[in-house]
Amino acid sequence: MPTFATPGPIAAIVEVAGSHVRVTASDRTDTVVLVEPVDKASRSDVKVAEKTRVDFAGGQLSVKTTVPGRKGGSVAIAIDLPAGSSLAAYLAHSDVHADGLLGECELHLASGLVRLDRVGGLTANIASGDVAIDHIDGRAAIDGGAFAMRIGEVTGAVRLSNSGGRAWIGHASADLDLSSGGCDFDIDRADGDIAATTASGAIRIGRLTRGQATLVNGSGDIEVGIDEGTAARVDVDSERGSVRDSVAQQANPDPSHAKVSVHARTRYGDVIIRRTANVEPHRASVTSTNSDELACVPSRVTSANRASPR
């Protein structure tokens, strides 16, 4: 298996088709890559594994399948690298599961499944697929077709634009700019300004702690929760649905709480503005997977089976 001396973070580039990829970032001084056929009895799988190129130069690791694998996955790739390394992944009918702390992450996904633990920032173009990230310590810029996106927590501003699908964020600490032709937007907690527009889809802000929310859709419900005691300005309307506003006026708002503003418009849907308790919900890891989801990916390489650096 290729092993390279890497005393610090590196830049990893993965370009694969029909592959299962597992990346483990940890406190280590080398990078190890293991490539195996998913089915060792399959000539086509063996060929894909044999033709997979692994190169390292100038602090940059490149792993590339030169022969496309089958949609179910022909090759299993395990990469162990130093924590803080950046990752750029170009994927077609492939899945990637990354554990540990990565730096900046770039995703180009034609189709497939991505699970990331912690990244320092995200740039993504997704045609279709399912992406889940536990924590983004920085900004995120995401665009593409119809896909599912789940982010447990993000500290920087988020810009998301797509044609459809579903988007969920557990805790957004900064501003959100969300637009779609037909995506449901579901935000558990938002601490900054929000602009969300979708032609057809529901918009839910479980808890808006401060800032301005401008929420517009053609069809679908709009729901916003505002902390008890927080002063709020509410301007909402539905052309063909009902409006339930239990927040509009509060006799004695807490002056220490930030003021929020909500502007919401829908044609075919209900608008619900309500008070919510100042309680943080428990959030499980969004990157949890079924045991068989990545069963073909080889486990992380241990010191016992590493080859000598070359």
Where are these regions (language model features)?
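Intrinsically disordered, low-complexity terminal regions
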Residues: M1-R310
